[in-house]
């Protein structure tokens, strides 16, 4: 069995409402699904005889601010039995919650926490959804495209006080001169 068989079999077997779009390539299969059917689709891929996905390699997020459902959540899966890679993608906005897959793949707990911490995508029924990479008092989600590059606060160690200090960052500038003339144009002074 190969990617082509798994693709054809999945296309013929899966309910059409579970999958918005399917693509096949030599590197693996891709399924686009709605957040409402994500858990059912992953359950099918894990438990069905002709797919047998045993490994959740990674869950990652992508921010597309121009889209209505701006966050893309990507599940990278591996079937060691059939030597096949499968990528499942779903989209969410700021308020849409995605079903947690920790009950199917226990390792998903860490990756769902990372996606929540970095992008703010929330997962329903996650046993411990809290920050994993940023500090507990951190405000915002740093991998969103609208998050400022310098952040909102500066965190530094103050040696005289022997403690960590958080200070708001001043982002405004009092004066800035822009020279709009091109350096390649010849100036004629007279």
From Swiss-Prot:
| Gene3D superfamilies on file | NADH:ubiquinone oxidoreductase, 30kDa subunit (3.30.460.80)
Q: Output the superkingdom of the source species.
A: Eukaryota
Entry keywords, A to Z? Electron transport, Membrane, Mitochondrion, Mitochondrion inner membrane, NAD, Oxidoreductase, Respiratory chain, Translocase, Transport, Ubiquinone
Tell me which Pfam families the record gives.
Answer: Complex1_30kDa
Membrane topology per record:
Peripheral membrane protein
User: What GO molecular functions are on record for this protein?
Assistant: NADH dehydrogenase (ubiquinone) activity
Q: What GO cellular component entries does it have?
A: mitochondrial inner membrane; respiratory chain complex I
Q: Where in the cell is it found?
A: Mitochondrion inner membrane
Q: Which reaction does it catalyse?
A: a ubiquinone + NADH + 5 H(+)(in) = a ubiquinol + NAD(+) + 4 H(+)(out)
> Transmembrane stretches, by residue range?
none
> Which InterPro entries does its entry note?
NADH_DH_suC (IPR010218), NADH_quin_OxRdtase_su_C/D-like (IPR037232), NADH_UbQ_OxRdtase_30kDa_su (IPR001268), NADH_UbQ_OxRdtase_CS (IPR020396)
Catalytic EC class: translocase
EC number(s) from the headed UniProt entry: 7.1.1.2
**UniProt xrefs under SUPFAM superfamilies:** Nqo5-like (SSF143243)
Give the family per the record: Belongs to the complex I 30 kDa subunit family.
Q: What does this protein do?
A: Core subunit of the mitochondrial membrane respiratory chain NADH dehydrogenase (Complex I) that is believed to belong to the minimal assembly required for catalysis. Complex I functions in the transfer of electrons from NADH to the respiratory chain. The immediate electron acceptor for the enzyme is believed to be ubiquinone.
The family database entries (PANTHER family) matched by this protein are listed as:
NADH DEHYDROGENASE [UBIQUINONE] IRON-SULFUR PROTEIN 3, MITOCHONDRIAL, NADH DEHYDROGENASE UBIQUINONE IRON-SULFUR PROTEIN 3
Q: How does it assemble?
A: Complex I is composed of at least 49 different subunits. This is a component of the iron-sulfur (IP) fragment of the enzyme.
Provide the protein name. NADH dehydrogenase [ubiquinone] iron-sulfur protein 3
Question: What lineage is this protein's organism placed in?
Answer: Eukaryota, Viridiplantae, Streptophyta, Embryophyta, Tracheophyta
